[in-house]
Amino acid sequence: MTAMRTYQVIISYAVLSELEAMAQYIASIYRPESGHKYVNRILGQLAALSYSADAYQYSRFKMAKSIHPKAETLTIINRKWTVVFHIDGDFVIVDRIFPSKTIF
C-alpha cells in the first residue's frame, strides 16, 4: 500500500480578496460572526485539498482552463461554490472561487 500524498495548500490573493468581500457582505446582512463562520467553513474545505487534491481530474470547463491549463475544479458548500485549483509539485494552488452557477 502506498502512502497518501499530501500537499501544501496556497490560496491566491484573488481568492483571499473574494473571501473577504464575501465575509463583509454576509456580515452586512446578518452578523459579523456569520460572515467569518461561513468563510472559515470554506477555508476548512480548501485545507482538505492537502490530502484530497489527487482525487480530482482536469476540468472540462473553459473558464477553468482559461485560468490555468491544468486546472481542476471542486464544488463546495452544497454545490454553491466552484473552486479552481491546480497542482504544482508539492503545492495545491487555489486560483479562484466562483458561484457555481456562473462557471461554464
Please provide the spans of the model-predicted regions.
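Enriched for short, Lys/Arg-rich terminal
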Residues: 2, 74-104
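Arg/Lys-rich, positively charged N-terminal/basic patches that mediate binding to nucleic acids
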Residues: 1-45
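A short, surface-exposed loop/turn module that caps and links secondary-structure elements
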Residues: 47-76
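A broad, structure-centric signal for solvent-exposed, well-ordered loop/edge residues
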Residues: 18, 33, 56, 83, ...
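General N-terminal targeting signals
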Residues: 26-28, 39, 43, 66, ...
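Residue-level signal for well-ordered alpha-helical positions
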Residues: 22, 52, 97-98
